[in-house]
Amino acid sequence: MANKGKYYMTTAIAYTSGKPHIGNTYEIILADAIARYKRAEGYDVYFQTGTDEHGQKIQEKAEAAGISPKEFVDQISGEVKRIWDMVNSSYDNFVRTTDEDHEKCVKKIFKKLYDQGDIYKGSYEGLYCTPCESFWTESQLVDGKCPDCGREVQPAKEEAYFFKMSKYADRLIDYINTHPDFIQPVSRKNEMMNNFLLPGLQDLCVSRTSYSWGIPVDFDPKH
């Protein structure tokens, strides 16, 4: 069968604050079915999955278990990979965010964006949900609690670096409008446009100082 070209796909990478659950497994099986179908059609498929291994929640779980964060994520990531292999998923690459090559790449991209003015230092203030590792505004809360998990939130403020997403909002809106099939299904395109882009895209917090388990910023080690 003739090669129809490259086809890249990825799952969301499983967060390693706890053992994998049925939702993670459901996703890898669906993604694997798509990868196999595309290969059968003649596409050169590159199928990636993996684990997300940094964050405050993981640091706290490791401390509670009496082990280092790296030991903790090694255990969880190993269990994720064991299950992905047990269901015979045909991924081409299993990426871990603690992999040396991944960390080097993140640092290189961060520095490049900072040097070209797309990352700047500021301060983040809001209502913080530790389990979700998310900041919220008062208007986003549901009954005064985290809109994602329903738990209590706490006032928090910290110095942080931000990526200037707002700088690219008009370019994104124009591209999506001129390429109607770029985001599918249409309901997701409408969600992105109406909930994020058109109301005014906010700059993204890309560093933290309140915990240490992450990829350090080379030129500002407290982040």
Language-model features: where?
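N-terminal Rossmann-like or analogous alpha/beta NTP/dinucleotide-binding catalytic cores
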Residues: 2-119, 133
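Structured secondary-structure scaffolds
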Residues: 2-49, 101-105, 149, 155-223
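Generic serine detector
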Residues: 17, 68, 77, 89-90, ...
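Short clusters of hydrophobic/aromatic residues that line enzyme substrate/ligand-binding pockets
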Residues: 58, 62, 136, 146, ...
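Alpha-helix boundary/capping detector
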Residues: 64, 110, 139-140, 198
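Short secondary-structure capping/junction motifs at helix and strand boundaries
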Residues: 88-96, 114-127, 139-140, 154-156, ...
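Cys/His-rich short segments
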Residues: 116-173
